[in-house]
């Protein structure tokens, strides 16, 4: 079954009931953006008796999800756009919390980490280009090989212009985030 909902919805029972009544699904993929939606959907799915495994987007990578949904998200599997356990991340979190008084791991940590990588990538390309000329920067970006970022080593694929990287797959096990696989996008 494939069902949709509107941004801002908080009651997903009608959609979930249609899915449940279809009886034709092995898992429930929650394509919601943030942990609050994922938590509400998980709670309501379990309330309606949906017992199939839950899959979600990277918005699930938040302690807030466990606070909202508790045992209802035990076993949920989701990908995150970047590695969230790497040297330097703890130091970044400490500095961020000291500066802003807020722990980004609650809801935006992967975006914060990738922003650090993007900044390092851009400043490195400007240095390598020796110029702020957009064409020179573009050429330097495309020539990037093995630049060690916060989350991964960055190398661009010359054919697709995508970054070679690995994507971690997580599962919530007994209220804890556990990395269960590191998927290589270019294997």
Task: Give the residues covered by each predicted segment.
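Extracellular/periplasmic Venus flytrap/periplasmic-binding protein
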Residues: 1-49, 84-91
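Conserved beta-strand scaffold positions in the cores of enzyme catalytic domains, especially
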Residues: 2-4, 76-78, 169
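Sec/Tat-exported extracytoplasmic proteins
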Residues: 20-23, 29-32, 45-49, 80, ...
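Extracellular/periplasmic catalytic domains that process cell-envelope and extracellular macromolecules
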Residues: 20-23, 47-49, 68-72, 131-133, ...
């Amino acid at each position: 079954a494939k069902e949709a909902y509107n941004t801002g919805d908080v009651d997903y029972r009608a959609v979930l009931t249609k899915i449940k009544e279809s009886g034709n699904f092995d898992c429930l993929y929650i394509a919601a953006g943030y942990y609050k939606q994922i938590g509400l959907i998980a709670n309501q799915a379990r309330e309606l008796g949906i017992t199939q495994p839950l899959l979600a987007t990277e918005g699930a990578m938040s302690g807030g999800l466990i606070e909202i949904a508790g045992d209802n998200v035990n076993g949920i599997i989701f990908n995150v756009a970047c590695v969230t356990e790497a040297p330097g991340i703890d130091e970044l979190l400490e500095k961020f919390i000291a500066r802003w008084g807020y722990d980004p791991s609650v809801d935006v940590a992967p975006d914060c980490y990738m922003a650090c990588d993007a900044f390092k990538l851009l400043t490195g390309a400007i240095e390598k280009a020796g110029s702020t000329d957009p064409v020179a920067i573009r050429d330097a970006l495309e020539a990037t090989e093995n630049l060690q970022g916060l989350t991964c080593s960055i190398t661009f694929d010359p054919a697709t212009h995508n970054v070679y990287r690995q994507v971690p797959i997580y599962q919530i096990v007994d209220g804890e985030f556990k990395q269960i696989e590191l998927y290589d996008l270019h294997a």
